[in-house]
Amino acid sequence: MSYINLPTVLPISPSKTRGQIQVILGPMFSGKSTELMRRVRRFQIAQYKCLVIKYAKDTRYSNSFSTHDRNTMDALPACMLKDVAQEALGVAVIGIDEGQFFPDIVDFCETMANTGKTVIV
């Protein structure tokens, strides 16, 4: 399922836009949110426009996401990623904290990567 209408591009086309999906895996308290924050900050330092999305029902830190050592970063709350698709189209890098809670994570990440975005989950 696509949230936007994209022109059809043949796989062999040299003008095909290429994005990427980076997945951060690990058990609880292993530093996944810290690594997400580190990667997004590196892109910000390189002058890329970034957006971080957090699960809206996680209300521990208001409109930011936080690591266990209390470092915070502004984040857009959402329950469904399709609800923030328009905001995501306006940036180059999309960070998604607690991706396992979003039922549309796979479709969203694939759609955004196919538009040339870097998606970090």
UniProtKB/Swiss-Prot annotation:
Protein name, UniProt field: Thymidine kinase, cytosolic
Organism per entry: Rattus norvegicus (Rat)
Annotated GO MF terms: ATP binding; identical protein binding; thymidine kinase activity; zinc ion binding
Upper classification of the organism: Eukaryota, Metazoa, Chordata, Craniata, Vertebrata
Highest taxon listed in the record's lineage: Eukaryota
Residue(s) carrying N-acetylserine: 2
Major subcellular site: cytoplasm
Keywords carried by this UniProt record: Acetylation, ATP-binding, Cytoplasm, DNA synthesis, Kinase, Nucleotide-binding, Phosphoprotein, Transferase, Ubl conjugation
One Gene Ontology term, aspect cellular component: nucleus
Top-level EC class: transferase
Modified residues (Phosphoserine): 2, 13
